Amino acid sequence: MAVTHSVGDMLTKIRNASRVKHESVDLKMSKINKSILDILKEEGYIKNYNIFDKKGISFIKAILNYDNKRNPAINRIDAISTPGRKVYSSYKNMPRIKNGYGILIVSSSKGVITGKQAKDNKVGGELICSVW
C-alpha cells in the first residue's frame, strides 16, 4: 500500500520504535522528513541520523535518544496537520506544548522551524507536529 502522508508515517515509526525501545528506526527520505529530524536532533529528541541507499531508494536511519534508565526522550509525538486537514497558525496564536516543555514543529516561509523560532521571527505557518 502506498504511503500518502510521509510525515505521518515517519512520526508513527518513531513513536512505535521509541515505545519498544529500539536503538534506531529506518525512515523514507524526503526533504521535509530530513528537516524535521534536524530539529529533533537539535532539541535532543534523537541522537543522530544517517542517510543511506537500499536498492536505489534513499532512507534515513534515525538513532533514538534514551536516558540512563532507558526511558525514551520522546514521550509523545503527534501529527497536527494531515493531508485532509491542514492546520495553520499565525505567530500570535502559536500554541504552547506542555506549558513550554515540548516543541511545536512548523512549516513556514523560513523553512521548517520550531514554534519558538516562528514566534521570534514573527512568521506563521502550517503546524506539522508536537513533541514532548
Curated annotation (Swiss-Prot):
GO terms for biological process? Answer: translation
The record ties this protein, via PROSITE patterns, to:
RIBOSOMAL_S8
Q: Give the Pfam families listed for this entry.
A: Ribosomal_S8
Subunit structure as annotated in this protein's UniProt entry: Part of the 30S ribosomal subunit. Contacts proteins S5 and S12.
Of which family is this protein a member?
Answer: Belongs to the universal ribosomal protein uS8 family.
NCBIfam families named in the record: PRK00136.1
The name under which this protein is listed is Small ribosomal subunit protein uS8
Q: Which organism is it from?
A: Borrelia turicatae (strain 91E135)
Gene designation per UniProt: rpsH
